[in-house]
């Protein structure tokens, strides 16, 4: 008996609730959202503690902030392949362990090197969780609920983001070690994640890929019921019957997935090049640039976090009703308008390279436009991109292909957040947000021309439709 079959047997005959399974997997999203954006509150304090002012200070600060992203690159590079070999659940267990380790070490760091190393460890967990959690959910969810359940992962990410803004705000006045508490509090939800992962099964599609059909049928039966389980198992078998399991990175060069691979890479690029993580990671700094005190900047970050949560809930409600492509088009258009508005608001204010208040009269417009940008992102590129990535690739390519797209996504994110302090002090906020707005405009054009609708179709049905470039992209 394999470890996965033994785990399935230990779970007994109780019925498994697919909502509970998806929610458990999505806690990884909460942890990565918290871990990624908690740095926004830490920035002002580590800048002073690690003496990141003066010559080269902006780039060293960028390195400290983006180190999580560089770690995520390694997590992205290996998570998909490891999940194809070891299983989706085992990779999520590893990610949970790394979240605990990273939070502990970062909160105790006394040097910049130790801090960066701890954040890189957290990046490994982020890179794994952001890829494998939605894949796992997509592979266990019924087709009619898949979009909403996969989007649950994005909801947990934004709840984690909002929780980090709340946590930072409430820990702001605990004393000189407030930034250590901001980082260390994540240990508790990470330990809970480890516990809950022991209660859920392995992905049935992965079990079939490994020839473990009885274990897959056991999981499908307790999730879907006996009748639907047999039909689902047959669909999975048929999708794999005539194909050899793809191994390693060479699978990415298969001509059959070239078109969907290009779509995935483009969406991953646009999600980050439009500046979402730069905004989240430096949100109090941006609000301070628009005018206002430290406490006000942290309070405004909380407001943005709440808007992010609310609009992600709206996206989850709409994604299986309105569809993936309409949400993308509407949201990306809103992102472009909001970013260009932010650029204009800063353009009429005097530029201050020292990152101090510049134009209190524009602070309200900047806040409104950032809220508009985050709301638009939350109904489009935030959740919808990951849903599409979990849907458009064939079973035997899914792990490695999503890993490649995630690696590219993390590379762009890390690069954007690394250079942001330097850009802000060199180009000014107006120039930075103008560039982001132009990229968002290009993203809108791409969505309208190339993205296909996947709503309501099983993963196996989508394979035949998307393996080669479609004649029309209007659907």
Where are these regions (language model features)?
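Alpha-helical transmembrane bundle of multi-pass membrane proteins
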Residues: 1-215, 219-221, 241-475
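Short, well-structured alpha-helical segments
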Residues: 229-240
């Amino acid at each position: 008996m394999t470890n996965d079959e033994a785990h399935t047997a230990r779970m007994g005959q109780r019925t498994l609730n697919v909502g509970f399974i998806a929610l458990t997997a999505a806690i990884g999203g909460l942890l990565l959202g918290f871990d990624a954006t908690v740095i926004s509150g830490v920035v002002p304090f580590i800048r002073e503690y690690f003496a990141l002012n003066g010559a080269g200070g902006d780039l060293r600060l960028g390195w400290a902030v983006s180190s999580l992203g560089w770690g995520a690159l390694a997590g992205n590079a290996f998570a998909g392949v490891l999940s194809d070999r070891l299983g989706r659940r085992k990779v999520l267990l590893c990610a949970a362990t790394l979240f605990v380790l990273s939070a502990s070490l970062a909160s105790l760091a006394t040097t910049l090197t130790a801090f960066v190393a701890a954040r890189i460890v957290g990046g490994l967990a982020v890179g794994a969780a952001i890829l494998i959690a939605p894949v796992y959910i997509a592979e266990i969810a019924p087709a009619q609920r898949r979009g909403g359940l996969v989007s649950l992962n994005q909801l947990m990410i934004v709840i984690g983001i909002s929780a980090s803004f709340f946590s930072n705000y409430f820990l702001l006045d605990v004393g000189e070690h407030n930034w250590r508490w901001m980082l260390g509090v994540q240990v508790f939800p990470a330990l809970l994640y480890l516990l809950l992962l022991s209660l859920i099964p392995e992905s049935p599609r992965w079990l079939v890929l490994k020839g473990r059909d009885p274990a897959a049928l056991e999981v499908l039966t307790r999730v879907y019921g006996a009748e639907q389980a047999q039909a689902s198992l047959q669909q999975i078998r048929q999708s794999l019957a005539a194909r050899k399991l793809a191994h390693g990175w060479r699978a990415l060069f298969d001509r059959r997935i070239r078109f969907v691979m290009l779509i995935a890479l483009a969406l991953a690029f646009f999600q980050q090049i439009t500046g979402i993580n730069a905004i989240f990671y430096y949100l109090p700094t941006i609000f301070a640039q628009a005018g206002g005190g430290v406490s006000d900047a942290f309070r405004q970050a909380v407001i943005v976090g709440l808007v992010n949560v609310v609009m992600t809930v709206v996206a989850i409600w709409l994604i299986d009703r309105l569809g993936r492509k309409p949400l993308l088009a509407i949201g990306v258009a809103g992102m472009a308008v909001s970013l260009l508005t932010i650029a204009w608001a800063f353009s009429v204010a005097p530029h201050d390279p020292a990152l101090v208040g510049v134009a209190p009269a524009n602070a309200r417009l900047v806040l409104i436009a950032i809220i508009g940008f985050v709301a638009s992102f939350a109904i489009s590129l935030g959740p919808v991109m990951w849903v599409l990535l979990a849907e458009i690739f064939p079973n035997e390519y899914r792990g490695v292909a999503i890993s490649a797209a995630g690696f590219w996504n993390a590379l762009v994110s890390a690069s954007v957040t690394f250079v942001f302090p330097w850009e802000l002090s060199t180009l000014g906020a107006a120039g930075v947000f103008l560039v982001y707005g132009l990229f968002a405009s290009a993203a809108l054009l791409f969505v309208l021309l190339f993205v296909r609708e996947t709503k309501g179709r099983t993963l196996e049905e989508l394979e035949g439709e998307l393996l080669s470039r479609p004649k029309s992209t209007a659907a």
